[in-house]
């Protein structure tokens, strides 16, 4: 019966560290994936012909 109490005590001390490490690794991996996607999209925008014209609004001509 003493072995079960030792395993329960170990697991109760182990799980908060495990969840903390798991959260940190998931956040770091998501940041890495998002930065890679941003870099790929920037490279694709460099090869786009209409990249410089996307944010320009058409100007209306005023007839005088």
Curated annotation (Swiss-Prot):
Full protein name: Small hydrophobic protein
Variant or mutagenesis effect after changing residue 51 to F: Impairs channel activity
Family to which the UniProt record says this protein belongs: Belongs to the orthopneumovirus small hydrophobic protein family.
Virion surface side: 45-64
Pfam families for this protein: SHP
TM stretches of this protein: 21-44
Gene Ontology annotations of biological process type: symbiont-mediated activation of host apoptosis; symbiont-mediated suppression of host apoptosis
GO cellular component: host cell endoplasmic reticulum membrane; host cell Golgi membrane; host cell plasma membrane; plasma membrane; virion membrane
Region (Interaction with host BCAP31): 6-15
Localization in the cell: Virion membrane; Host cell membrane; Host Golgi apparatus membrane; Host endoplasmic reticulum membrane
Membrane topology (UniProt): Single-pass type II membrane protein
Species per Swiss-Prot/TrEMBL record: Human respiratory syncytial virus A (strain A2)
Domain of life: Viruses
Intervals, Intravirion compartment: 1-20
Activity regulation description: Channel activity is inhibited by copper. Also inhibited by small-molecule pyronin B.
Modifications the protein undergoes after translation, according to the UniProt entry: Four species of SH have been detected in infected cell cytoplasm: a 7.5 kDa non-glycosylated form (SH0), a 13-15 kDa form that contains one or two N-linked carbohydrate side chains of the high-mannose type (SHg), a 21-30 kDa polylactosaminoglycan-modified form of the protein (SHp), and the isoform generated by alternative translational initiation. Of these different forms, SH0 is by far the most abundant protein detected during virus infection. Tyrosine phosphorylated.
Function: Viroporin that forms a homopentameric ion channel displaying low ion selectivity. May play a role in virus morphogenesis and pathogenicity at various stages of the viral life cycle. Accumulates at the membrane of the Golgi apparatus in infected cells and may facilitate virus release by modifying the secretory pathway. May enhance host membrane permeability and disrupt cellular ion homeostasis, which can be sensed as damage-associated molecular patterns/danger signals, triggering NLRP3 inflammasome activation and inflammatory immune response.
Residues listed as glycosylation sites in the UniProt record: 52
Keyword Glycoprotein in record: yes
Region described as Interaction with small-molecule inhibitor: 38-43
Involved in opening and closing mechanism of the pentameric structure, annotated site positions: 22, 51
Molecular function via GO: identical protein binding; monoatomic cation channel activity
Main location: virion
Keywords: Activation of host caspases by virus, Glycoprotein, Host cell membrane, Host endoplasmic reticulum, Host Golgi apparatus, Host membrane, Host-virus interaction, Ion channel, Ion transport, Membrane, Modulation of host cell apoptosis by virus, Phosphoprotein, Signal-anchor, Transmembrane, Transmembrane helix, Transport, Viral ion channel, Virion
